[in-house]
Amino acid sequence: MKQIAAILTEYRHYSHADVIVGKFLKGFPTDEGMRPARVRIASMYVDQFPAADMSRDMASAYNVPIFGSIRQALTLGGDSLAVDGVLIIGEHGDYPWNELEQHLYPRKYFMEQVCGVFAQSGRAVPVFNDKHLSYNWADARWMYDRARQLGAPYMAGSSLPLGYRSPWVEHALDTPLREAVAIGYSGLDVYGFHALETLQCMVERRIGGETGVAAVTCLEGDAVWQAARAGRWSRQLAEAATAQIPGVAGVPLEEVLLGPAVFLIEYRDGFRGAVLMCVEREGGFETFGYAARVGGDGGSEVQACEVFLGGDPHPHFSYLSLNVEEMFVTGKPSYPVERTLLTTGILEAALISRHRGHVRVETPHLDVTYRSYESVPWRPTGPRPVGASATPWA
């Protein structure tokens, strides 16, 4: 059984470490039942131990040593790389925020330490980086390039691409997409990333594949609705997305998207995307949606869905983790890391736009090109969790 090192900022109840590492330790709840792990968590490095820390108890229960450095976790206390894969979960913990309201998690530092062990050992193993690569483009690009330089299979990103779509929408490769909108909620840094990945995992499947992003603008408040009236994002698509969401179908967008913000994304091939955020969660909605205008010169149709994330036991993280495990077992990423490289850069550009007074930010550096997956090994296909996916863990 392959041995995996878990490199964590902190491990407490419902943290990302809990809902990811916990499944590698206890098994993966899926709609078809519990699936035992095919790999073993062999070591942990934990950066912080809050009062609600779970890492020590879980490590003791599953006989996993916690090491005092990332190098030791990867070498199992020896002199060279001794594991077959690395989970980097740099989410949650007591870290500062900057003037862009980005949470300064040490993901680049974690990756730098991991890659140092790879370089010193003369070989690399697969790495998964939870959520966006870093809070800034320079670090994210370094992480991506360093993994490629060392030959490390690399995955990253949100669990949203593995969420429950209702109704099921999955564009075929080379679909003629004209325009798309994703809807999300909560903070622009912490959850705006999830909404961006909801959008990007869909629109990367358009004709010609992904070409990169030319410019990004962030708007807030009444400027969001003014932009809709000016045709800068499609109200029709946003309404199509909310029409699929129980409780808000038919409700005016102004009553759904409280404290609104929008990311206007201009792709290099002329495609337009938008991410709408309900920033004020009190009284607003708390889910995700997607809609696109699909069709060539002969006409078009709107395709839309809700993207639902279940509560305890958080099955969307099961499907995310199963795809990561697939990479650990096969050595092949389940979907392209370039998606998350691009969404990392889009998010930074949006927050820069906001900080500078909601100006348009040109992004010539986001010339990220790639082709989407043929298929994803593990994912739900129903509208809601069932079976083990809907059974809370004790």
Residue ranges and their predicted role:
Residues 83-90:
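N-terminal Rossmann-like NAD(P) cofactor-binding module of classical short-chain dehydrogenase/reductase
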Residues 91-161:
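Beta-strand-loop-alpha-helix segment that lines the small-molecule cofactor/substrate pocket
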Residues 1-61, 180:
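N-terminal Rossmann-like dinucleotide-binding module
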Residues 180-272, 278-284, 342-345:
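Rossmann-like dinucleotide-binding domain that binds NAD(P)(H)
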Residues 73-81, 168-171:
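Short amphipathic alpha-helix with an adjacent loop that forms part of the alpha/beta core around
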Residues 53, 283-394:
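C-terminal helical cap and adjacent loop that interface with cofactors, partners, or active-site loops
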Residues 65-74:
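Short acidic-hydrophobic, aromatic-tinged amphipathic segments that line or gate anion-handling sites
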